């Protein structure tokens, strides 16, 4: 296995290759810039697939681990702080990494509608990919934070420069909310360093277990600090997820960002919130999560119902999808709050599945917008006649979104709710209403857009081109593959999730 | 005790001697040169002197403390590290003002260079003094040189206004400092900081507690002004805006670093023994933390409304002063390391930012934020370097500014001053708005002109050093941390082996 130890590093930094080539292409060469930009997402995809293939689902602990000491802060009266460059993959991160590389590659294809400033666009795009991959593969909290901030800065530019009319407000709001989230996260991480003396994830796991094994800590002075850290982490990743009431920034980004960035944002960036909640919330502070579980469940319920209800009244397809994301993130919260194996599995499944589904939906929206110049549902009416293929894919995506059996959304929702019904049957029961609402709002939107009276101005519209159809079909294929054969996703994460569940004693 | 002048080891003062010689030489040359002769080479001479002084300090870095002139002058690790930062900053600023394009309407070139040198000399003296008198002499040398520098563009009203404000308010603050120092002398009968350190506790315990505190408060009033900390910051925006950009950069970087050296030394050395009486904990720490917190809040909040770049940088500097005060206030465990690291990072990024501002201002012929509009389209590389340095000022990883703030935050949390940590964090997020406003201008706004921004070669070098330093220190802070960790800071606080007489 030693040959593969550097694999996480290679995966994370492989987009640099594309960036390097991009630097040497003149600004006017749009064709070349597009091709190189798309090609730049291929090396991480290939390397991630290699990693996935080499990943041993039975092995406990981190694989392909790499640990190099990096920064040593000398402090008097102690040996100082050691921050390390530690990378590695476990069952939780491997599926998210593969998902990230796939969505990034497809989003790069989805960037074809852009016409200006392609060079800086693709440079930032690949930088964003580095940040995202690093977030999922870092095994040191300091390093995690650095990658996390890279995604923040890159997204700010991508939204602010290439977005729609209100792009600057969206970028600003994004910066404010997420900046505050990162700041809280940093405070939490520094405090963790003080309490446990390390920011290495594996060491932290050992030391938090040791602390929680002695119930006396509840009486000690460390109790408020631990709670403070835990709450900071909850809020920081709650903003990212986003959990109600921190979701407003995300709606704006969904509506204003360029389509490819929304694919990434909705597909991957929101999942960093879920990842952080499980990795740093659930896994490091089991007893605290137990006490907060009801609260998380209630938040999840609010997310599900609030998102679904508002998705129903939206007239803009992008806003329907944005609110449906809020609703679907509630299901992730449900899965986490369940605190059992099934629920957690549902949460991770939902993260991956929603990543693919929302990427697909936004790709379709982008294609529709490119042709019709609108995203308002009422104005789209009757598209099916002019564009049977696109409308068909939209319908299929809608079915995935509402959780049709045989597609990934069903498996995820099923698992999350199954997990939830054991500890909180009532909340889960009410939450299940969200599934019905999802069917209502999805079908309403999709039907109104594709069927309904045919408008004369759609006469001359062309159906989707191969370059659009291929990524759509790939995503659809993945969604169905997970739906039909969930083991593909479930197996690699099994051991890791079981370890987490053992730690939380659920 | 009495030593003949010949027996004193003058080599420890080499940096100052180089600077004073060069300044004197420059004055003489300025007088002797015919009016029409070019004065450009005087700038190179000044640069050579500063680089020479800096090299000397760098070579002897880490040497043990040396006392000179009856203990009034000292070269110790603190002095050396502060000196390196401010000599480095001065060298970059000199380099920036050398090129023909960057004259900014300063007619008296010779005067400009020797005033810069005397200012650096004053700053350098401040870092090395162990006596209230030498400290004050250094401070005034720096201040008076700066007053003239601020108003060196005699024909411009805003420059005049800047100098005028600076002189009046600077004079008042010097008076406060002097008044405070007089109490210290009255209470302890000495101006030597180490003697003061030993005797002030006695004074505190024998019924003069209120006078001890009064002396500190009075000095803090003056220091607050010198480091441009709130609520004594009012002068900074006007002076920053009215001065030539190179002088603004000097005030922001060198002046501020020197003032921090002064504050650290006086507060820490003179009042150190009060820790045992819990006076630090109960009075000094809250006092400094309130100043720090007010600076962060006022600086960052008011910066949001600025439209002039140099005013924006002034408020940003006020906020940064607040951050740097935290380790001193909380007596953090890595007080010197974090302060110096931050000042070094701050100097690098600020000098670089001002170098860009100078070029942009000259090109647009005004200093409003809109001068940066569309810079990315005109000169992508300049925009990118500016972005990196502004991100560093905002404290975004992977930059020196981030690591500096991180380090200071560690100090605040380690000493359990959570509220100041919270203020730091919240104001940092607020600061994103105005720092990103610069970025928004550069990337999101259309460019009024199409031609690339002209950057003189010397300015380009300064920007290059700023960016490389900012990113390098952000990625590999160990390089500096290791060196700082090696130094024996405690030597600074301890009393020299042969305490000099009163």
Predicted regions and their residues:
Chain B
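Alpha-helical transmembrane segments of multi-pass membrane proteins predominantly involved
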Residues: 1-502
């Amino acid at each position: 296995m030693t040959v593969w130890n550097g694999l996480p590093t290679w995966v994370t930094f492989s987009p640099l290759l594309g960036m390097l080539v991009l630097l040497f292409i003149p600004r006017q060469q749009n064709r070349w810039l597009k091709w190189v930009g798309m090609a730049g997402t291929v090396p991480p995809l290939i390397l991630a697939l290699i990693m996935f293939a080499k990943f041993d689902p039975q092995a406990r602990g981190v694989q392909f681990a790499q640990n190099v000491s990096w920064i040593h802060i000398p402090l008097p009266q102690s040996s100082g702080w050691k921050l390390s460059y530690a990378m590695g993959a476990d069952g939780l991160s491997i599926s998210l990494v593969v998902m990230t590389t796939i969505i990034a590659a497809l989003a790069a294809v989805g960037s074809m509608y852009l016409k200006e400033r392609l060079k800086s666009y693709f440079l930032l795009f690949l930088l964003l990919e580095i940040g995202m991959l690093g977030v999922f593969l870092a095994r040191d909290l300091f390093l995690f934070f650095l990658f996390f901030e890279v995604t923040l800065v890159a997204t700010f530019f991508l939204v602010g420069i290439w977005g729609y009319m209100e792009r600057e407000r969206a970028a600003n709001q994004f910066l404010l909310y997420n900046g505050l989230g990162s700041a809280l996260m940093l405070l939490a991480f520094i405090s963790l360093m003080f309490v446990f003396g390390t920011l290495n994830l594996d060491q932290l796991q050992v030391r938090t277990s040791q602390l929680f094994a002695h119930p006396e800590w509840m009486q000690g002075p460390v109790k408020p600090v631990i709670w403070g850290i835990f709450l900071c982490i909850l809020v920081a990743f709650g903003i990212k997820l986003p959990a109600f009431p921190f979701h407003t920034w995300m709606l704006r980004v969904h509506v204003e960002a360029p389509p490819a960035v929304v694919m990434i944002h909705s597909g991957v960036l929101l999942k960093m919130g879920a990842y952080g909640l499980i990795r740093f919330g659930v896994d490091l502070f089991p007893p605290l999560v137990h006490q907060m579980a009801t609260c998380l469940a209630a938040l999840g319920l609010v997310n599900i119902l609030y998102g679904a209800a508002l998705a129903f009244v939206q007239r803009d397809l992008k806003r329907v999808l944005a609110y449906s994301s809020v609703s679907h993130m509630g299901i992730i919260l449900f899965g986490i709050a369940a605190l059992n194996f099934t629920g957690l599995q549902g949460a991770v499944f939902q993260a991956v599945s929603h990543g693919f589904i929302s990427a697909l939906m936004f790709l379709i929206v982008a294609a529709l917008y490119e042709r019709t110049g609108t995203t308002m549902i009422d104005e789209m009416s009757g598209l099916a006649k002019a564009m049977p293929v696109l409308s068909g894919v939209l319908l299929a995506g809608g079915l995935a979104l509402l959780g049709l059996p045989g597609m990934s959304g069903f498996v995820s929702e099923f698992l999350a709710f199954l997990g939830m019904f054991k500890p909180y049957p009532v909340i889960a029961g009410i939450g299940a209403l969200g599934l019905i609402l999802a069917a209502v709002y999805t079908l309403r939107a999709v039907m109104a857009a594709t069927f309904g009276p045919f408008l004369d101005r759609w006469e001359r519209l062309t159906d989707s081109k191969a370059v659009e159809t291929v990524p759509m079909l790939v995503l659809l294929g993945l969604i169905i593959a997970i739906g039909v054969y969930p083991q593909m996703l479930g197996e690699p994460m099994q051991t890791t999730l079981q370890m987490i569940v053992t730690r939380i004693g659920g | 005790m009495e030593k003949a002048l010949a027996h004193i080891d003058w080599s420890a003062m080499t940096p100052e001697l180089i600077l004073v010689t060069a300044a004197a030489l420059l004055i003489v040359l300025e007088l002797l040169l015919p009016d029409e002769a070019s004065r450009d080479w005087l700038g190179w001479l000044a640069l050579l002197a500063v680089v020479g002084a800096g090299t000397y300090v760098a070579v002897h870095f880490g040497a043990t403390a040396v006392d000179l002139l009856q203990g009034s002058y000292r070269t110790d690790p603190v002095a050396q590290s502060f000196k390196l930062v401010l000599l480095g900053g001065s060298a970059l600023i000199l380099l920036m003002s050398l090129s023909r394009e960057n004259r900014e309407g300063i007619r008296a070139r010779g005067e400009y260079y020797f005033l810069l040198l005397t200012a650096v000399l004053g700053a350098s003296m401040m870092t090395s003094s162990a006596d209230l008198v030498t400290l004050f002499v250094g401070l005034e040398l720096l201040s008076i040189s700066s007053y003239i520098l601020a108003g060196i563009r005699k024909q411009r009203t805003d420059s005049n206004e800047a100098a005028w404000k600076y002189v009046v308010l600077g004079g008042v603050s010097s008076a406060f400092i002097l008044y405070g120092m007089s109490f210290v002398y009255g209470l302890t009968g000495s101006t030597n900081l180490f003697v003061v350190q030993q005797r002030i506790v006695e004074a505190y315990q024998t019924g003069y507690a209120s006078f001890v505190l009064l002396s500190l408060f009075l000095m803090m009033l003056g220091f607050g002004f010198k480091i441009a900390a709130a609520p004594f910051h009012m002068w900074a925006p006007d002076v920053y805006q009215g001065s030539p950009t190179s002088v603004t950069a000097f005030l922001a970087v060198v002046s501020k670093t020197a003032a921090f050296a002064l504050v650290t030394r006086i507060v820490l050395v003179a009042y150190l023994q009060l820790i045992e009486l819990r006076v630090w904990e109960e009075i000094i720490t809250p006092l400094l933390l309130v100043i720090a917190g007010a600076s962060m809040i006022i600086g960052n909040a008011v910066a949001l409304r600025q439209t002039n770049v140099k005013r924006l940088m002034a408020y940003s500097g006020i906020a940064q002063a607040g951050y740097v005060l935290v380790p001193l206030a909380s007596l953090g465990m890595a007080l010197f390391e974090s302060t110096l690291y931050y000042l070094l990072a701050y100097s690098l990024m600020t000098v670089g930012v001002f170098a860009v501002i100078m070029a942009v201002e000259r090109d647009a012929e005004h200093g409003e934020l809109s001068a940066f509009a569309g810079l990315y389209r005109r000169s992508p590389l300049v925009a990118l370097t500016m972005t990196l340095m502004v991100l560093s000022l905002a404290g975004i990883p992977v930059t020196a500014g981030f690591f500096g703030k991180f380090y200071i935050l560690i100090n605040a949390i380690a000493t359990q001053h959570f509220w100041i940590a919270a203020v730091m964090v919240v104001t940092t997020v607020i600061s994103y708005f105005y720092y990103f406003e610069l970025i928004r201008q550069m990337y999101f706004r259309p460019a009024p002109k199409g031609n690339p921004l002209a950057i003189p070669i010397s300015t380009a070098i300064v920007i290059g050093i700023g960016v490389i330093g900012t990113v390098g220190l952000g990625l590999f802070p160990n390089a500096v941390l290791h060196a700082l960790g090696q130094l024996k800071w405690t030597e600074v606080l301890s009393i020299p082996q042969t305490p000099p007489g009163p």
